[in-house]
Amino acid sequence: MGRASREAPKRLGEKLLQIRSTLGLSQEGMLRRLGLGEDYGRHYISGFENAEREPSLPVLLKYSKICKVWINVLVDDELDLPANLPAHEMHGGIRRKSVKRKRKP
């Protein structure tokens, strides 16, 4: 019995970079804000933002608390982050408009 593979969120790295940029933090600053500090280097945050590595659930929960959005906003590619971060209260994200695709005949 192995682990079932799952599709990784495609926009997660983009959202994590947006959070850090909006908060005006360096990668080291983000590490400190996440409470990871000296245990990890800048490359750890860079790996998340470049989609080279997926953050663990506890790290995603910390991102969620820092910017006051529900965790599903981070991992659901159909949801966008709110314009203002951190949100004034927990935010459920902004649903992207669905694009109707033309069907092939």
Predicted features by range, described:
Residues 1-2, 6, 65, 72-105:
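Short, charged recognition helix plus adjacent turn
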Residues 5, 20-23, 38, 52-53:
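Flexible interhelical turns and helix-capping residues at alpha-helix boundaries
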Residues 11-14, 24-25, 40, 55-58:
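Residue-level signal for the short linker/turn that defines the boundary of a DNA-recognition helix
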Residues 14-35, 62:
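Short basic helix-loop element that most often maps to the first helix and adjoining turn
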Residues 35-55:
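Recognition helix of helix-turn-helix/homeodomain-like DNA-binding domains
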Residues 52, 56-73:
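DNA major-groove recognition helix of helix-turn-helix/homeodomain DNA-binding modules
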